[in-house]
A protein has these predicted regions:
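Polar/charged alpha-helical tracts
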Residues: 35-39, 148, 172, 289-292
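Active-site/acyl-donor-binding loops of N-acyltransferases
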Residues: 61-95, 100, 180, 186, ...
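A conserved beta-strand-loop-helix scaffold within acyl/acetyltransferase catalytic domains
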Residues: 1-14, 53-216, 306-311
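Acyl-donor binding region in acyl/amide transferases
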Residues: 1-81, 200-257, 263-264
């Protein structure tokens, strides 16, 4: 942690796949589970750690809500802002939803669609359930690699043997309607694949790959449009773009929700050292933000981190 070798306590799957993490609890038992887990972290001799980092808690997660509103002593726990997740509430019909986009976005999408159809003989879109579609996963990784290979000096963290194996095995554990691949093909060749999960009538845009040879046609944007259509047609209420505030996401939405990490440092030497470095880094970040804000507006911003009780 910050170049200090530490024993870290984290969610299973941390930094592997999930953007939204949380405690798993039976409905109605969320608060009691949170209290029990936090008590065990504080007092159990089995919870030996230097750094506790429960990452990727969105603001409607069970653990975030408990820590943010609890009046009991949450000594040493700190909620640190991590990233924003753009998302859009879907209308009841695709046409109605499209009318909610800006006029410039609708015009750009229509122009790119017409250009693609004029240039190519055959343009086909399709949606495939994640279950039973391993070929679509292969196409996704192939297109993802092709796109990133075209960007010199940049490297994807998704296209690795470990994540390929993880996702391949994951597809065999899913049930029908847990998600879909949205594929756009040109002249019988896939040029864009989107990897979408579904949960409780919410669609989550997890990953994508597209052929850079079709960049001029906005092939990725056109496929997102088709994925949103399919999400609406299958009863989804929201379309979540997950972490990352890339400009293209805000062509389809204006809203976002924040994700946080719960931090706590152990009482040992390494835990105290990691905690000191964490606070110093936070002060430096706030100082840099203050200087930037002073140059821009002349006023000093507040901290985005919420320490529930400092150590």
């Amino acid at each position: 942690y910050l170049k200090i070798p530490v024993r870290k306590l984290a969610f299973l799957g941390d930094r592997v796949a999930g953007d939204y993490m949380d405690l798993i609890a039976e409905p109605g038992y969320e608060e009691s589970c949170c209290r029990a887990v936090l008590h065990r972290i504080r007092h159990s001799s089995m919870a030996v750690y230097d750094v506790l980092e429960l990452d990727c808690l969105c603001t409607d997660s069970v653990l975030y809500r408990h820590l943010h509103s609890a009046s009991d002593a949450n000594d040493g726990f700190c909620l640190m802002h991590r990233f924003n997740c753009p998302r859009t509430v879907l209308a009841e019909s695709f046409d109605t939803h499209m009318q909610g986009l800006s006029a410039s976005t609708r015009y750009a999408l229509g122009r790119k669609q017409r250009k693609l159809e004029r240039t190519c003989e055959r343009v086909v879109t399709g949606n495939f359930d994640l279950v039973g579609s391993p070929d679509m996963l292969d196409e996704l990784f192939n297109l993802h690699r092709k796109r990133w290979d075209s960007m010199q000096g940049r490297q994807s963290t998704f296209s690795t043997p470990y994540r390929e194996l993880f996702n391949s095995r994951l597809l065999h554990r899913l049930q029908e309607d847990d998600g879909f691949f949205s594929c756009m093909s040109v002249d019988d060749r896939p040029v864009s694949v989107l990897y979408i999960f579904r949960y409780k009538n919410n669609a989550f845009f997890y990953q994508n790959g597209w052929d850079p040879a079709f960049a001029a046609y906005g092939i990725g944007l056109l496929n997102i449009q088709q994925a949103i259509r399919h999400a609406i047609d299958t009863g989804c209420r929201t379309f979540d773009f997950l972490r990352g505030e890339e400009a293209y996401k805000y062509k389809f939405c204006e809203d976002s929700r924040q994700a946080y990490a719960v931090m706590r440092f152990g009482p040992g030497i390494r835990g105290r050292a990691a905690g000191a470095l964490f606070r110093i880094r936070g002060w430096l970040k706030e100082l840099r933000a203050s200087f930037r804000n002073i140059r821009a507006t002349g006023s000093r911003p507040g901290s985005q981190d919420l320490c529930l009780q400092g150590r």
